[in-house]
Amino acid sequence: MAIKIVGDPLPNIPWEDRPADARGVVWRSARNPIIPRDLLPTSNSIFNSAVVPYKGAFAGVFRCDDTARNMQLHAGRSQDGITWELEPERIHFACKDTDCDCAEVNRWVYGYDPRVVWIEDRYYVTWCNWFHGPTIGVGYTYDFETFYQLENAYLPF
């Protein structure tokens, strides 16, 4: 069976062939954990579910739980997709929309399970958010340095 990738080539993706004894559709890297749970001085665990190619390297948004298990979102970068540098401070979302109440929309309680996708001219970020109850947070970035939050996708009522 031939492998067909739909999209731009990713010649620098850190690919590993399926181990001979692997039976599943997906297999884990032999180098796991890629990001150690305590990479940041305050982190108890780090989850890397939102990595994308960015300017010939990789960038992403990561859930980092501190030792009190507060769930925060942090930006990170890697040249090779294996060795990562994460921002020590959580993402603080800005608000460009003058029609929304930025203080209310950006009130942070928790964030987890982020995803990142490129659409047109920016990277959109979605995550499990809290806004008067569980909801889906939506934001975007152009550069993985400044992040803008939009209205939540689903209100919890």
What do the PLM-derived regions correspond to, one by one?
Residues 1-109, 117-157:
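Beta-rich carbohydrate-recognition and catalytic domains
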Residues 113:
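Beta-strand-rich binding-surface signature
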